Amino acid sequence: MQASNSFSSPDSLSTYLSEINQYPLLTQPQEQELSKRFRAGDLAAGHQLVTANLRFVVKVAYEYRSYGLKMSDLIQEANIGLMKAVQKFDPDKGIRLISYAVWWIRAYIQNCILKNWSLVKLGTTQAQRRLFFSLARTRRELEKMGAGDANVVNAEEIARKLNVKASEVREMEQRMGGRDLSLDAPMGEDGDATHLDFVESESVSAVDEVADRQQANLTRELVQRALRRLDPRERFIIEQRVMGDAEMTLSELGEHFGFSRERARQLEIRAKDKLKLALVTLMAEAGVDESTLNA
């Protein structure tokens, strides 16, 4: 089970994108059948699961184009993440492969980026690493809104969004930069079509919609399963203080159970901590990387 993606020029990337666009997408029943066959030792079924999702992998890899790595390296790591997901995917869970695989894909891409950025460029603290990834994502959002690159001119706005100092944004911006072969680049000298056009289609848009929906469904499922690990009182507190449309005040919560507002606050903190621990545990059991859930 492997996905070939050797390219180092616009033409070779174009050829690769054209090739993967030829692989048919799978319905959920087809996906489940192939997954069961692969788990039974059918490597050809695993290969079909991989190739059917390569277009989606490219679109995820493209989101990380601002980190100065070659698109070929990003796509290669993303493909490895996809293959890992195929190996661990359980078709009996009732979710689509793409919604499960996206966390593996992002995790492998991010790990590749972290390995290739020196500590001098990136910084050594966890906060600096979080800023590293958040900053690029915010830059892409600003570009989509027509605000231009997230450079020093936008430092204050970005700092407010990320809840960091503007000086930290400026420093990280200076560390970042450089792009490789872009999927936005024209395919030919006289053509307006771009490389990304090869992976932009109604079918891929449908895949994206399914992925978003399945990711939301998976998140809701994990939260509900985590809630079931709480006792009835803890569950009530979370439902009324976190998940309810009309949020109970701490005073109302204390009155409901017959204890003080301060005691209600303490129990709320305990319930939230227990829910978080249960959710992290369930994510690990499902093979979902916690750090990629908010990616």
Curated annotation (Swiss-Prot):
Listed name of the protein: RNA polymerase sigma-C factor
Where do we find the motif Polymerase core binding here? 73-86
Q: Name one GO biological process term.
A: DNA-templated transcription initiation
Quote the DNA-binding region ranges, renumbered to this chain: 250-269
> Which Pfam family, any one, appears in the UniProt record?
Sigma70_r4
Domain of life of the native organism:
Bacteria
Summary of the function given for this chain in its UniProt record: Sigma factors are initiation factors that promote the attachment of RNA polymerase to specific initiation sites and are then released. This sigma factor is essential for normal fruiting body formation.
GO MF annotation terms: DNA binding; sigma factor activity
**Protein family according to the UniProt entry:** Belongs to the sigma-70 factor family.
Q: Which residues form a coiled coil?
A: none
Identify the PANTHER family for this entry: RNA POLYMERASE SIGMA FACTOR RPOH, SIGMA FACTOR RPOH HEAT SHOCK RELATED
Recorded hits in InterPro entries, A to Z, give: RNA_pol_sigma-70_dom (IPR014284), RNA_pol_sigma70 (IPR000943), RNA_pol_sigma70_r1_2 (IPR009042), RNA_pol_sigma70_r2 (IPR007627), RNA_pol_sigma70_r3 (IPR007624), RNA_pol_sigma70_r4 (IPR007630), RNA_pol_sigma_r2 (IPR013325), RNA_pol_sigma_r3/r4-like (IPR013324)
List keywords of the entry alphabetically: DNA-binding, Sigma factor, Transcription, Transcription regulation
